[in-house]
């Protein structure tokens, strides 16, 4: 979600295109089969796991002079592209811990690059760290003197109801950030409840082979 939105924005801002659609999706059963265990295996899920969201989101990014822009209610004012951060996490059932360091690094770098403070944002929203990843993120940023407090939300914690849906640490997957952006974040920007949001989709760079070989899982945001 974040990569497609970033590339679409760069393409439009650079004049290579006037209108670009950024689309992404994920599927629970496909992710389980590919990166964990087939559903038929009925393996027990540790409490640190997240539940891959079955969902999709699409967004149209258009140049100011394009007809689509007349329907726009918000804009992408800037992008901070994160870097790969590897803390040596090897457990594919603990993705929040693998991605949180990358999220912390990108937030810190974004604030440095823009000269802003966390208080300049109505919300800072990460993609799919889950409840455990959120705790790690806040601890890492606190060590740098950055206190998120109640400004931080995570799509993985928003998309499911922890009281009625047992998804353990929360939701995950490309569709998690995309559907939350489309159904939760953008409507609040359109209604004027929020003026500025730092949206930070998170990702893990693993394959179905690498983690089975005991390799670490780098994260990016």
Question: Which residues fall in each region the model found?
Answer:
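Generic structural signal for well-ordered, non-membrane alpha-helical segments
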Residues: 1, 5, 13, 49, ...
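Active-site-proximal alpha-helical scaffold in enzymes
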Residues: 1-22, 59-64, 172-193
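A generic, well-ordered mixed alpha/beta core segment in the N-terminal half of proteins
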Residues: 1-50
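Acidic, glycine-rich active-site loops and adjacent beta-strand->loop/helix elements
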Residues: 24-33, 82-83, 201-206
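Condensing-enzyme catalytic core mediating Claisen C-C bond formation in acyl metabolism
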Residues: 38-109, 113-116, 146-166, 191, ...
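Long, repeat-rich segments with strong aromatic
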Residues: 102, 108-140
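Short glycine/threonine-rich loop-to-helix capping motif typified by GTGT followed
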Residues: 129-144, 209-217
